[in-house]
Amino acid sequence: LKIIELGSGNGRDSVYFAKQKLNVVAIDQSISGVDIEKKNLLDEDNNYLHLLAKDFVYEDYSKYGSIDAFYSRFTLHSITKIDEEILLPNIYNNLNSGGLFCIEVRTTKDPLFGKGELCEENTFINNNHKRRFIDTDKFRKKVADIGFRELYFVEKNNLSIYKNDNPVLMRLILEK
């Protein structure tokens, strides 16, 4: 099984996958956080985690061979709508038949939506943090038009509480 994590951040999820003996390629513009997490892996598990400092939007995924899953947790909010238009077909075209695209992202129903400075559609800068909030209806139609089949969808809070933040998230599992 090969998983590509888009925007791996500190690498927590990629490290978890590697501990489960799943091959994971963790892509982030900065891999310094993942390097710290990777030190917690046993030597035998280190072979399952591959770190790449790249822009996941413009990556050529055809060079990875067989890809079983793409995983995006709190990353689609960090790219522009134009980048999303490039990324989604790229994922679909490079995913194995029957492969999965797993997404967790803040939506336009999130309490932070509309707070801060509007810089483009559904995108706000609040406390020096830029977020693009996803309109779930439009996004689900877009991925269906690309060819994905929806296996699971939920949009609600209480999915990923962190300190005082209880965001409204979309969790979506798509199949090619």
State each model region's role:
Residues 1-49, 53-63, 83-86, 100-175:
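Class I (Rossmann-like) S-adenosyl-L-methionine-dependent methyltransferase catalytic domain
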Residues 71:
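A conserved beta-strand element that flanks and buttresses the S-adenosyl-L-methionine
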Residues 74-78:
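Short catalytic micro-motifs in class I SAM-dependent methyltransferases
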Residues 85-97:
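A short glycine-rich, Lys/Arg-flanked "PGG" loop and its adjoining helix->strand segment in the class I
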